[in-house]
Each structure stands twice: as C-alpha cells, then as structure tokens.
Swiss-Prot record:
Cell division in keyword set: no
InterPro entries: UPF0761_bac, Virul_fac_BrkB
UniProt cross-references to Pfam families, sorted A to Z: Virul_fac_BrkB
Domain of life of the source: Bacteria
Keywords, ordered alphabetically: Cell inner membrane, Cell membrane, Membrane, Transmembrane, Transmembrane helix
HAMAP family membership: UPF0761
Descriptive protein name: UPF0761 membrane protein Csal_1895
NCBIfam families, per database record: yihY_not_rbn
Gene Ontology cellular component annotations, sorted alphabetically: plasma membrane
Cellular compartment(s): Cell inner membrane
C-alpha cells in the first residue's frame, strides 16, 4: 500500500515543481507586462481584424453571409456574456470600416499587422529567439494569419453546419447528448486548433507538434475555465456596476482581454519549456557543453535570486555529475550550499571564456553544433578562435624549423 502512495506523492511533487518552474518562466519573461501591452494593441486591432475577416469571407461566394454568423459564434463562445453590449459596438465599428476608402483600409491593415509584430516579438522572447522574421518571410506569416485564418474558420463553420444537417450525425449527436454537447465542445476545439497553429507558426524557430499541442491544450482548457469563473464573478459580485454604471462593459472587456492574453502566453511558455527540456538532455552532450549548461543554469537561477537543486543537476548530467561539477567548484563558478543546492559563486563579468576553457579538463568539441540556443554565441566565439588558430598553425613545418635553426645559429 505504501508504494502507490509514494508514487502518487512523487508525481504530485513533479507536477508542483513543473508548475512552479512554469510560473517562474512566465515571471522572468515579464508575462504580465507583455499581456498588458498586447491588451493595449488589441484595442486598436480588434476592429481591423473583424474587417479583414468580413472581407476575406465575402470574397468567396460560398462564404457569403457567413461572416456575421461566424462573428456571433466566436464572440458568444469566446467572450463572456457580460461583454455583449461592447461586442455590438465593435460590430458596428466593423460595418462602418467596410465603407472606408483604400487609404483607410490600408491603415486598418497596418494596425492589424502591428499587432502581429507585437505577438511575434513576445513569442520570440519566450522561445529565446533574438531575431524576428524579416522581409518576405514576415509578410508571408502575417498574410497567412490574416487570410488563411478566416478561411479556415469559415470552412470549419460550413463543415459543422453541414454535418449537423446530416441525419446520421444528428442521430449520433442525440445519443451522445445532442447538439448542446456539440456546441459545448466546438469553442474548445476551435481555440485548441487556433493555439496549435499560433504556437507552431508565430515563433521564428522550429516548434515540435506535440509541444504545441501540450501548450494549446493548457491554454484552451484554461481559457474555458477562466471564462466560466469570470462569468460567475460578474454574476454574483456585481459591485462593478455601482462604480462604473453604464460604462461597466469597457473595464470588464479590458480585464477579459488581459486575462486571455496571459493564458495564451502561459500556453506558449509550456510549449517552449517542453522544447527546452528536450534539448536539455545534458547527459548526451560532450562534457565541455555539460559544464557550460550548468553555468548557464546557475546564471539563470542567480538572476531570479534562486539556487538550483542538487538532484536536478544530477538528473540532467547523469553519470558525469561528479566529473562535471568538480572543475566548476575548483574554478569557483559553482558553490554548493548546505541544503543540497547549488548557486553561482563568481561574477561571470570578470570570468573570460579563455579562462573557463583553460580550467576545463576536456577538449572543446568544435565539430559539434551548439546544443542549446543560449550557447550559440559561445559556440560562435570558439569557432572564430579556432579559425585564427588554424591560420597560425598552417605554416609549413620546414619553414618553422628553418626559422628556429637561424635563431639558434651564432
């Protein structure tokens, strides 16, 4: 009986530790500030997005008349009922925007693209990507989101309407709980699919499908739970109406948009964290890169004012744990505390890469690529040093020996 309890306790510890690390990542990347910035940008971009949605769906004869239904479906399923009044104003703004001139439409399109740029920068920061897309690649990404997104939503709406009209599907739906169950699963499915697409397409790096699925699942479930909790709060604690009166819908909508962006960013943090954990299988790295991985991990923890657990480093390093930590202790980079934790012991600003390389007992594996994104700059510096070393050592042996003989002669 004790063994299952120990296993359950171990899994609970792993889950709690993972949640703590996820929250720490979110805080380290200024998730709340980023969500605030995206909320501000959304205020200017929501009407252009609705206008683009209408324009794209109206351009295809099969989608005529779907845009209004699709907007109603999206807002009814993804926005709490408290924002219905504000949603009607947004629809009115979108209808008025359709009668703008070409210059006005271009301005709306630029506003929508600015929001995409902000989202891409936030995601690149989460995935530790220093360069954003430029030129044709960025244009293709934004064009795909602004065009394929509405088309896919319209196609999905048509498909769901068609399936709902089939006798066989309606019979199966009645057995499984009827159309109500289908409509309850529809927003979760739509948001999950959209998050998978966003997490894989927006960051300027390769994101594995299963990592995007994990992040999308967390974000979609959290969004549904948040929507229910938000609606309950507004229903049973209506004090906001006393304070804001008829303008109550505006701050509520802002809070909901902020909460939604925070959830989206948390899902992105999970997808990026899973990718980093996969790349952080240090036991398969060369010892030199393992030592650098330890230094990088200690440095990140030092910036957060924290220490690293001994068992975490042992799990990552595997059998080389003692061999890797010993020279780092001798160099003074890693210091072990009394509570089985490690912390950074030296100012890395006063430690050069040359001194670190000389202190390590292993050869630098220059033939290998950088094992992690945070080590790309160090890898590039080592390769540059190796190129200079090769230029010096490519002199013929005969020339060097003859030069030495001339210096030795009286």
């Amino acid at each position: 009986m004790r063994r299952p309890q120990l296993l359950d306790r171990r899994w609970l510890t792993i889950i709690l530790r993972s949640l703590r690390e996820l929250i720490q990542r979110f805080d380290a990347h200024d998730g709340l500030k980023t969500a605030s910035a995206l909320t501000y940008t959304t205020l200017f971009a929501v009407v252009p997005f609705m206008t683009v949605l209408y324009a794209m769906l109206s351009a295809i004869p099969s989608f005529q008349g779907i845009s209004e239904q699709l907007q109603a479906l999206i807002f009814s399923q993804f926005v709490p009922a408290t924002g219905s009044a504000l949603v009607e104003h947004l629809r009115d703004f979108s209808r008025q925007a359709r009668s703008l001139t070409l210059i006005g439409l271009m301005f709306l399109l630029v506003t929508a693209v600015m929001m995409m740029v902000t989202v891409e920068r936030a995601f690149n920061n989460i995935w530790h990507v220093s360069r954003s897309r430029r030129g044709v690649s960025s244009f293709l990404l934004y064009w795909a989101v602004l065009t394929l997104g509405p088309l896919l939503l319209g196609s999905g709406f048509l498909l769901s309407s068609y399936l709902a009209s089939l006798t066989l599907v309606r019979g199966a739906a009645e057995v499984l709980g009827g159309p109500v169950a289908f409509l309850r699963l529809l927003p979760l499915t739509l948001s999950f699919t959209a998050f998978v697409f966003i997490y894989m397409a927006v960051p300027n790096c390769r994101v594995r499908f299963r990592h995007a699925v994990a992040g999308a699942g967390l974000a979609a479930l959290a969004l549904e739970l948040a929507k229910g909790a938000f609606s309950l709060y507004v229903t049973y604690f209506p004090s906001y109406q006393v304070i804001y009166g008829t303008f109550a819908a505006v701050p509520l909508f802002l809070v909901w948009v902020f909460l939604s962006w925070a959830i989206v960013l948390v899902g992105a943090e999970l997808a990026a964290w899973l990718g980093e954990r996969r790349r952080a299988e240090w036991r398969y790295w060369a010892p030199f890169w393992q030592a650098l991985g330890v230094v990088s991990h200690l440095y990140d923890a030092h910036r957060r004012g924290q220490a690293v657990y001994d068992r975490e480093l042992a799990m990552r390093l595997g059998a080389r744990y003692s061999d890797v930590m010993a020279p780092l202790q001798t160099l003074g980079v890693a210091v072990q505390l009394d509570n089985d934790r490690w912390m950074l012991g030296r100012d890395l600003g006063a430690l050069s890469l040359w001194d670190f390389q000389r202190a390590m007992p292993w050869a630098v594996p220059l033939g290998e690529s950088s094992p992690a994104p945070e080590m790309q700059a160090i890898h590039a510096a080592l390769q540059e040093a190796e190129r200079h070393r090769q230029q010096v050592l490519t002199q013929p042996m005969e020339h060097l020996l003859a030069e030495g003989a001339r210096n030795d002669s009286p």
